[in-house]
């Protein structure tokens, strides 16, 4: 693709302006960036970094270990976190933000309705 760059082992940069680096990384969305081990991006402007992370929403960001950011503009960070709705933010360990603009942080917390905030 145009202006894409892949470096490392088993890496793929298949969208325009994408960058994949590390081991078994895949950057598909336009302008997306996947780095680390087994990371994947699939939408425009998404960024996945760390180990086994996935950023599938437009402008989503997943970082850490086994994290998933699938909502538009969502952010998931830490260990086993999920931000699955638009503008959702999950951070910490085993947290889930599934409401729109929801925020879950800490250990095993869930913010499941729109604009919710869970911490602990």
Outline where the language-model segments fall.
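Periodic small-residue-enriched repeat registers in elongated scaffold domains
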Residues: 1-120
């Amino acid at each position: 693709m145009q202006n894409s760059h892949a470096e490392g082992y088993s890496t793929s940069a298949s969208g325009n302006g994408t960058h994949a680096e590390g081991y078994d990384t895949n950057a598909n969305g336009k302008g997306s960036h996947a780095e680390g081990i087994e990371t994947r991006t699939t939408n425009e402007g998404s960024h996945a970094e760390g180990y086994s992370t996935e950023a599938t929403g437009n402008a989503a960001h997943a970082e850490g270990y086994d994290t998933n950011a699938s909502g538009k503009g969502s952010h998931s960070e830490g260990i086993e976190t999920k931000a699955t709705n638009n503008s959702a933010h999950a951070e910490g360990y085993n947290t889930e933000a599934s409401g729109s603009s929801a925020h879950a942080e800490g250990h095993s917390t869930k913010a499941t309705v729109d604009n919710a905030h869970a911490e602990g």
